[in-house]
């Protein structure tokens, strides 16, 4: 097969591993910067171009689109989809998962347990919002934040009010969530491919922090997950419509709680911690699903 990887930086670990895994299985691979793709959108001659040339048909496209370029990156991916390429994560699923508020609403509708979450626009509702999530300590999150950026633990009610007011002063969209104290700065990252959790790690926050993101200096170890955690991770990914997802779960006294569903999970931390060939599993999923029937169905 001919596979395109959409990424701004082909030297990143995940891109290199996906390229390596695909080539090892006999596929042709090209890494394309989505911001250098441009499109002709017309009924008779839709096409996609790259650095002065019209791109050929790709059997499959692997999106590695960062949150900063979600709008244009998913537009480029959507054009590949329209031309019959199989996407490992559809554009609509990526945009759904990137919207933190929408994704939490969808997960809640499916009965998937979450930390109690509140959102309000008016400053008049701040007090009720804090009460809604159980009072302080609580977590304030930027809706647009990633990798632990824009996440603040407010230890007291006064601190919570100050943080919320400060974010509002910047015209930022925020969520307020209950603080799961018993998680002790730990969470479980489940890597889902299709209908299977192929690997899971426990992430631990560095000393003095409560954010367990590896990008923030957190540590990782292999996690043994329960059947319930496995079921919830798969259901969360499927609710977003994602073939590949990193599902972050907090272990609370009342049971596992989904914190976030990541549409473009990094492979380095999970592969190096567990030894699982996740890139290979992703390519195998493409091989099973990027069929001629798919191309006919989508008009390719």
From Swiss-Prot:
The keyword Nucleotidyltransferase does not apply. SUPFAM superfamilies: Glutathione synthetase ATP-binding domain-like. Binds 2 magnesium or manganese ions per subunit. It comes from the Bacteria. The keyword ATP-binding applies. GO terms for molecular function: ATP binding; metal ion binding; ribosomal S6-glutamic acid ligase activity. Its EC number is 6.3.2.-. Keywords: ATP-binding, Ligase, Magnesium, Manganese, Metal-binding, Nucleotide-binding, Protein biosynthesis. Mg(2+) 1 binds at residues 248, 260. This is Probable alpha-L-glutamate ligase. It comes from Citrobacter koseri (strain ATCC BAA-895 / CDC 4225-83 / SGSC4696).
